[in-house]
Curated annotation (Swiss-Prot):
<feature type="binding site">
    <location>
        <position position="72"/>
    </location>
    <ligand>
        <name>Zn(2+)</name>
    </ligand>
</feature>
<dbReference type="GO" id="GO:0006465">
    <property type="term" value="P:signal peptide processing"/>
</dbReference>
<dbReference type="GO" id="GO:0046872">
    <property type="term" value="F:metal ion binding"/>
</dbReference>
<comment type="function">
    <text>Plays an essential role in type IV pili and type II pseudopili formation by proteolytically removing the leader sequence from substrate proteins and subsequently monomethylating the alpha-amino group of the newly exposed N-terminal phenylalanine. Substrates include proteins required for pilus biogenesis PilE, PilV, PilW, and PilX as well as some components of the type II general secretory apparatus GspG, GspH, GspI and GspJ.</text>
</comment>
<feature type="transmembrane region" description="Helical">
    <location>
        <begin position="183"/>
        <end position="203"/>
    </location>
</feature>
<dbReference type="InterPro" id="IPR014032">
    <property type="entry name" value="Peptidase_A24A_bac"/>
</dbReference>
<dbReference type="GO" id="GO:0005886">
    <property type="term" value="C:plasma membrane"/>
</dbReference>
<feature type="binding site">
    <location>
        <position position="100"/>
    </location>
    <ligand>
        <name>Zn(2+)</name>
    </ligand>
</feature>
<dbReference type="GO" id="GO:0004190">
    <property type="term" value="F:aspartic-type endopeptidase activity"/>
</dbReference>
<keyword id="KW-0511">Multifunctional enzyme</keyword>
<keyword id="KW-0645">Protease</keyword>
<keyword id="KW-0489">Methyltransferase</keyword>
<keyword id="KW-0808">Transferase</keyword>
<keyword id="KW-1133">Transmembrane helix</keyword>
<comment type="similarity">
    <text>Belongs to the peptidase A24 family.</text>
</comment>
<protein>
    <recommendedName>
        <fullName>Prepilin leader peptidase/N-methyltransferase</fullName>
        <ecNumber>3.4.23.43</ecNumber>
        <ecNumber>2.1.1.-</ecNumber>
    </recommendedName>
</protein>
<dbReference type="InterPro" id="IPR000045">
    <property type="entry name" value="Prepilin_IV_endopep_pep"/>
</dbReference>
Length: 290
């Protein structure tokens, strides 16, 4: 196809197109982050009522990632297409609803911008390759999972498990690791945090993390192979400890306040996939091993 040939031979055009795509995807991720937990809660309630033998709730209006159309949470004004252009509409509207002038949350444009910038970097890092396409899907998934976990302390299986399988499929073709390394990465990724979970619970009687974290690290191992696991665990622990203390201080929260670990795993895994080899070599040279 002429367009694909053009993008393959013009790296800058590929990066710019990927940034624009990232803006659109970022807008959709805002919808996913807002609606998916509510959709899951609806399903849980329906399943609980069925298990308890209760009458099902009256049929509710359709609620999914497509319907109903997005609306202002304050006045209910339905957002029109020209009011939903990523970043542009937010700036044109001055960050306010066109109807009631209520402030629009700053996180919406920030998510769009972050998705665009990360997507552009992936395109620049990998070039016009299958690796770039796969890494874009992973990046978008990690962003959505991180935000949902930060809001609800929840890592949805509907996001984690498909990405785990996608990582194994990608590495069937050797995009990031061999298939054997990816399989071991998935197994060891799950078992490593599972072991820490039970050891911590035996010692303290408390649950230090959720099962979603096990699955997330297994998913990252399926993408990068078992070799990225030590660096991912180390980076996520360091970043989580530092930011966790800062967040507790800022919120004046108690030390027992739960802190989602998923975002730190996602950040660390993403870094390990892109720069793991360079970070490891630099550390070994600094430590005098090479």
């Amino acid at each position: 196809m002429p367009l694909l040939d053009y993008l393959a031979s013009h790296p800058l055009a590929f990066v710019l197109c990927t940034i624009l795509l990232g803006l659109l995807v970022g807008s959709f991720l805002n919808v996913v982050v807002h609606r998916l937990p509510k959709m899951m809660e609806r399903n849980w309630k329906a399943e609980a009522r069925e298990a308890l033998g209760l009458e099902p709730e009256p049929k509710q209006a359709t609620y999914n990632l497509v319907l109903p159309n997005s609306a202002c949470p304050r006045c209910g004004h339905e957002i029109r297409p020209w009011e939903n252009i990523p970043l542009v509409s937010y700036l044109a509207l001055g960050g306010k609803c066109s109807s009631c002038k209520a402030a629009i949350g700053k996180r919406y444009p920030l998510v769009e911008l972050a998705t665009a910038l990360l997507s552009g970097y992936v395109a620049w890092h990998f070039g016009f390759t299958w690796q770039a396409g796969a890494m874009l899907l992973l990046t978008w998934g990690l962003l959505a999972m991180s935000l949902i976990d930060a809001d609800h302390q929840l890592l949805p299986d509907v996001l984690v498990l498909p990405l785990l399988w996608l990582g194994l499929i990608a590495n069937h073709f050797g995009l990031f690791a061999s298939l054997d390394d990816a399989l071991f990465g998935a197994v060891f990724g799950y078992l490593s945090l599972w072991s820490v979970f039970w050891l911590f619970k035996l010692v303290t009687g408390k649950e230090g993390m959720g099962y979603g974290d096990f699955k997330l690290l297994a998913m990252l191992g399926a993408w990068g192979g078992w070799q990225i696991l030590p660096l991912t665990i180390l980076l996520s622990s360091l970043v989580g400890a530092i930011l966790g203390v800062i967040m507790l201080r800022l919120r004046n929260a108690e030390s027992g306040t739960p802190i989602p670990f998923g975002p730190y795993l996602a950040i660390a895994g993403w870094i390990a996939l892109l720069w793991g080899d360079q970070i490891t070599r630099t550390y070994l040279q600094f430590a005098g091993f090479k």
